[in-house]
Amino acid sequence: MVNTLEKPGFDEIRPGVKTPAKETILTPRFYTTDFDEMAKMDISPNEDELRAILEEFRVDYNRHHFVRNESFNKSWDHIDGEKRQLFVEFLERSCTAEFSGFLLYKELGRRLKNKNPLLAECFNLMSRDEARHAGFLNKAMSDFNLSLDLGFLTKSRKYTFFKPKFIFYATYLSEKIGYWRYITIYRHLEKNPNDCIYPIFEFFENWCQDENRHGDFFDAIMRAQPHTLNDWKAKLWCRFFLLSVFATMYLNDTQRADFYACLGLEARSYDKEVIEKTNETAGRVFPIILDVNNPEFYNRLETCVSNNEQLRAIDASGAPGVIKALRKLPIFASNGWQFIKLYLMKPIAVDQLAGAVR
C-alpha cells in the first residue's frame, strides 16, 4: 500500500533525500567573494564596535536553544496534501538559505584566519549559528520523511561571485529581513496559538536574535568602510539591493500565499509589514531607503506577480518549447520594465542617520 503522505509529489535523490529545488532567480543563492580584498580591509575606523560584537558572538546566547523538545514527538501526518507540500518547501528554502550563509561565513573565517583574525573569528562564530539553523531545519524536514543532502547541495549549486561591498549589502539585508520575518511570525502566533501548526515557530523569538546580531556585524563592517555608504555609487547600489531583496521576497511569498494562510497570515499584509520594518532598519546605516509607502511601489510589484502567474501557465501548457519562449518574451520585457521603473522611483534620503560610527 502506497503512503501518499510520505511523498507528496517530491523527487528524491534516494529514498528520504529530497532532490534540491530547481535554481531560479527567486531561489536562495550561494555566494563567493574576493577573499584577498576582504583580508586587506582596514577596519580600524570602527574596530571598537566590531570587537564588542565579537564579544556578543562569543557569549553564544543560543547555545542551548536549538534542542528539540517533546512537542516534536508526534506524528505530523495530519499536515497532508498541499499544506504538507507547502510546508516542506518552506523548510527547504529556509534550510538552503541558512546553509548558504554557513558556507560563505565558514570559508571567510578560514581564508581570513591569518590575515584579519578579528573578522575571521566573527565569521567563524556566525557560521556556527548558521549551521545550527540549517541543521535544525533539516531535522524538521525529517518529521515529514524527507531531508536535504547538504554535501550534495554544496557541490551541485552554482556560486554567485560578489565583490566584498556587494556581499555586505546583500548579507546585511538578508540577515535583517530574516529577523523581521521570524519575529513577525512569532508575534502573530503568540497572539494566535491555534495557528501554530508545528513547534519550530516557537523557537523563532530567540532564533531571530542571531539574525539581528549578524546584521549588526555587517552594519559595523560598512561603517568601517565609509565608501560603501557615502558616495553617489553607494546610494545607487543600496537602492538596487533594497529593491532586489524586497521584490524577491514579495514575488516568492505571493506565489505561496496558501502557506501563510495555514499560519493565519495574509501573505501580502505580512510582506508589507516586513518590508516596511526592514526598510526602516536599513535607514540606520544606508544613505537612502525606498519609498515603499508610495502606491506605485506595490502596484508595479503586483504587475510582476501577475506576469509570473502567466509565465507559470505557459510552462504548464503543452505548447512546443519555441512557442513557449515566444510567448514569454513580452512578459519578461514587462517584468524588466517594472523593475526599471521601480528602481527609478525617488528614494528617501536618510544621510543624517547613516555613515557615522556609532
UniProtKB/Swiss-Prot annotation:
The keyword Cell membrane does not apply. GO terms for biological process: chlorophyll biosynthetic process; light-independent chlorophyll biosynthetic process; photosynthesis. GO terms for molecular function: iron ion binding; magnesium-protoporphyrin IX monomethyl ester (oxidative) cyclase activity. Pathway: Porphyrin-containing compound metabolism; chlorophyll biosynthesis (light-independent). Keywords: Chlorophyll biosynthesis, Iron, Metal-binding, NADP, Oxidoreductase, Photosynthesis. CDD domains: ACSF. It catalyses: Mg-protoporphyrin IX 13-monomethyl ester + 3 NADPH + 3 O2 + 2 H(+) = 3,8-divinyl protochlorophyllide a + 3 NADP(+) + 5 H2O. Its EC number is 1.14.13.81. Its cofactor is Fe cation. Belongs to the AcsF family. Catalyzes the formation of the isocyclic ring in chlorophyll biosynthesis. Mediates the cyclase reaction, which results in the formation of divinylprotochlorophyllide (Pchlide) characteristic of all chlorophylls from magnesium-protoporphyrin IX 13-monomethyl ester (MgPMME). This is Magnesium-protoporphyrin IX monomethyl ester [oxidative] cyclase 1. It comes from Synechocystis sp. (strain ATCC 27184 / PCC 6803 / Kazusa). The lineage of its organism: Bacteria, Bacillati, Cyanobacteriota, Cyanophyceae, Synechococcales.
